[in-house]
Amino acid sequence: MPAPSHRRRARLGLAVGVTLSLLAAARGGHAAGLYFSDRGVRPMGRAGAFVAGADDLGAIWYNPAGLADAKTSALVDFSWLRFNAEYTRALRIVDADDVVRVVRSPTVEGSSPVIPFPTIAGSYNFGERREFTVAGGVFAPYAAIATYPETVDGRPSPARYALGSFEGSALIFGGGFFAYKPTEQLRFGIGLGALVGQYQSTVTFSASPPDRLLAAPEQPEYDAESRFRVGPIFAPTGSFGATWVPLRFLRVGASFQLPMVVSSSTRFDVRLPTASVFDGGRITGRDAHVRFTLPHILRAGVEVRPTDELRIEAAYVREFWSIHESIDMTPEGVAIEGIRGLPPRVPIPAIKFPRNFQDSDSFRIGSEYTFDLAGYKLDLRAGVSHETSAIPRAYLSLLTIDMDKTVLSLGGGLHVGEHWRLDAMYAHLFASSVTVSPEEARIPRVNPLPGNAPLEAVNGGQYSASADLVGVGVNYIF
């Protein structure tokens, strides 16, 4: 005897839900655009305008040619990105009678834990004219790692279908660099490195039978929690740059970073819903493969030094996110088994999740002024930048939250003797609010089973975010 309709639909929802959990693993690997802010305590004191004027170990990210002026030195700094986000979900539902409804959820707030993002680097300067410099370093991207509550106003959080926790995630960029200064007017640099680590998260999916399997009311007893780990990640890249000093007071710099291809295994666990219709069901297989591409980056800057004490740089950065068209996820032997009313084994197919990102532009102005105070040399830094989002509004979601943003920054450096420099920085990131109407939202429900209801976008709603960046560091010249 065939299973009742609602039971059959719920069991089909389980297959869809497992697919969603795998897809969440793939999407999560992107880590909210990988970073919400540019990096480095001294560079961000200048709002990231540190391309032509790069002259210490902070150059490993901005322009490796600047390492030619880093001398033999060591740098350690730590920054905390205090990130806050709010999301009010709006879901467009077309029920079985073709009635269109928009369901709005309570506003959910997410915040980042206290994570000190490090930079650790060292350089060695050598040659008859000290024209060669080798350097190495490791650092963490300034990722907007937010955790959202499980409940809002006593009800399950609407964010539970986007993301939960990122505990256990660790992504580090490491690399080696070489710089050459043939004359006082020219500097060249090259670097080879890789993004390494692992990404962990929890995501809840719904196999609720009413309104096309996964739509409202999304009863909690039909929720299933998935935990996944993407890794080990090893995504190599390279960079090269040049700095030209045609006049004593003028520096022109540019650099280019190659794209990174993340191609990694994924392992996941799914806790089935507690509803009785899932009794007897099981999931076989735990492995999948995720692949996507992170962008190449072009940086250019012009720095003027009207006096020996004052530096002012205007910089431009273009990140070619249009290369990030999709995330491809291939399950490896994952299937649903033991569900009455379904075939004995329902395999989960490969998925191509559309991203359709766009190139982003950043315009930056930063300054640095050096003066003597009570027998110590002190650097004061300030800057402002504006960056456009790489995420088209229709594809914005909590898993990859990014908007147009403006950064205001202040920083300073205290020189102690001839060898030590102590740095500090504060920046505030003003991000614009974005409303994604349910009609324009384009992140779909993923349904691998033919014959089910039409796909419905799930990322509609209002998004807002802001962040503070605080950092301290020390630089030592041998």
Please describe what each predicted stretch is.
Residues M1-R9:
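N-terminal secretory signal peptides that target proteins for export/translocation
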Residues R7, L23-A26, T107:
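Serine/proline-rich low-complexity intrinsically disordered segments, especially terminal tails, linkers
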Residues G28-V134, V138-A140, D359, A427, ...:
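N-terminal, post-signal peptide beta-strand-biased segments of exported outer-membrane/organellar beta-barrel
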Residues G13-A24:
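Bacterial N-terminal signal peptides
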Residues H30-P43, I115-F478:
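Outer-membrane beta-barrel porins/channels
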Residues A3, T19, Y376-D379:
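Intrinsically disordered, low-complexity segments
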